């Protein structure tokens, strides 16, 4: 089972995926997490 979490903030947003039982923030093309 794969889990993805999305935080839709008013200024920034973030996406995390579960890897090995720990959440990992997905970075954009510039390497930023927002």
UniProtKB/Swiss-Prot annotation:
Keyword Nucleotide-binding: yes
InterPro entries: ATPase_NBD (IPR043129), Heat_shock_70_CS (IPR018181), Hsp_70_fam (IPR013126)
GO molecular function terms listed in the Swiss-Prot or TrEMBL record: ATP binding; ATP-dependent protein folding chaperone
Residue ranges that the Swiss-Prot or TrEMBL entry lists as coiled coil: none
SUPFAM superfamilies the UniProt entry points to: Actin-like ATPase domain
UniProt key word GTP-binding: no
Keyword annotations: ATP-binding, Chloroplast, Nucleotide-binding, Plastid, Stress response
GO cellular component, one term: chloroplast stroma
Subcellular localization(s) per the UniProt record: Plastid, Chloroplast stroma
Family under the similarity heading: Belongs to the heat shock protein 70 family.
Function: Interacts with newly imported chloroplast proteins to assist in their maturation.
Protein name: Stromal 70 kDa heat shock-related protein, chloroplastic
Organism: Cucurbita maxima (Pumpkin)
């Amino acid at each position: 089972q794969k889990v993805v979490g999305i935080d839709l903030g008013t200024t920034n947003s973030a996406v995390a995926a579960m890897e090995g039982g720990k959440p990992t923030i997905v970075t954009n093309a510039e390497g930023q997490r927002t």
